[in-house]
């Protein structure tokens, strides 16, 4: 029988390191709550980034997924995770920096019915052409369910990467800094609304699940966290269009107090005519336009 999460970490002398952005969760009830929020189906193929001491890992495995692949960069955690694997052979452990792995580099083939086969090759950036090729695929052999307590310092970057590979994902249930979750879920004309809100809401359905107090972690961070669930939309825009939206929103929100006709005039010389055609008030500021408004502008460019 496995020891408690905290005792297991102590036995292996695994203490959180700042350089890895580690804040461990020892509360098994919180881990269970996160997994319940994901509505994880049996026989799912799950991906977890940064399992650390394995609290969330255990909660996922108790739901009997077909496989759970964990990506961990901290060598100190590997013996601990391997002990969990002795009880759950459907656990696959990959030592790697999560920022060096794309979902398309995780093969759909199952190795001996356990986890994903990771093709050890240099991780390639998502280019327009490559992403479009992915999006145009007629059939995808597998989809992954992502459940993770993401390190604050890489959380937003990982989310943006995964959005561009959303066709490979069933859902994402993520713990992030509360401020980031509020930005993801923000509606137009609010302070938190920005580029991240626009891009996310064009690609996924967003749902904030619950807040997590700093006291839930060891050591306690200085800020609150929150759980957000992201479910890819069936008919999301192409990567080419999303890249245009990124370009437009970068300019628009750089001067969020400027009127949109001023912010975009260098990118769209006939911006007044475009806004008139789309029936968008040209006195609006960046925060007043809905995600679909930005998409409609991108479609005209």
Swiss-Prot record:
Alphabetized Gene3D superfamilies for the sequence: Ribosomal RNA adenine dimethylase-like, domain 2, Vaccinia Virus protein VP39
InterPro entries documented for this protein: KsgA/Erm (IPR001737), RPE2 (IPR022436), rRNA_Ade_diMease-like_C (IPR023165), rRNA_Ade_Mease_Trfase_CS (IPR020596), rRNA_Ade_methylase_Trfase_N (IPR020598), rRNA_adenine_dimethylase (IPR011530), SAM-dependent_MTases_sf (IPR029063)
Compartment(s) of residence: Cytoplasm
Catalyses which reaction(s): adenosine(1518)/adenosine(1519) in 16S rRNA + 4 S-adenosyl-L-methionine = N(6)-dimethyladenosine(1518)/N(6)-dimethyladenosine(1519) in 16S rRNA + 4 S-adenosyl-L-homocysteine + 4 H(+)
Leader sequence residues: none
Keyword tags: Cytoplasm, Methyltransferase, RNA-binding, rRNA processing, S-adenosyl-L-methionine, Transferase
MF GO annotations: 16S rRNA (adenine(1518)-N(6)/adenine(1519)-N(6))-dimethyltransferase activity; RNA binding
SUPFAM superfamilies: S-adenosyl-L-methionine-dependent methyltransferases
Keyword field contains Transferase: yes
Annotated binding of S-adenosyl-L-methionine, by residue: 23, 25, 50, 72, 97, 149
Chief site of localization: cytoplasm
Keyword S-adenosyl-L-methionine (UniProt): yes
Assigned GO CC terms: cytoplasm
SMART domains the UniProt entry points to: rADc
Annotated EC: 2.1.1.182
Pfam families attached to this UniProt entry: RrnaAD (PF00398)
Free-text function comment from the UniProt entry: Specifically dimethylates two adjacent adenosines (A1518 and A1519) in the loop of a conserved hairpin near the 3'-end of 16S rRNA in the 30S particle. May play a critical role in biogenesis of 30S subunits.
Similarity annotation: Belongs to the class I-like SAM-binding methyltransferase superfamily. rRNA adenine N(6)-methyltransferase family. RsmA subfamily.
Protein's name according to its UniProt entry: Ribosomal RNA small subunit methyltransferase A
Native source organism of the sequence: Rickettsia africae (strain ESF-5)
Lineage start: Bacteria, Pseudomonadati, Pseudomonadota, Alphaproteobacteria, Rickettsiales
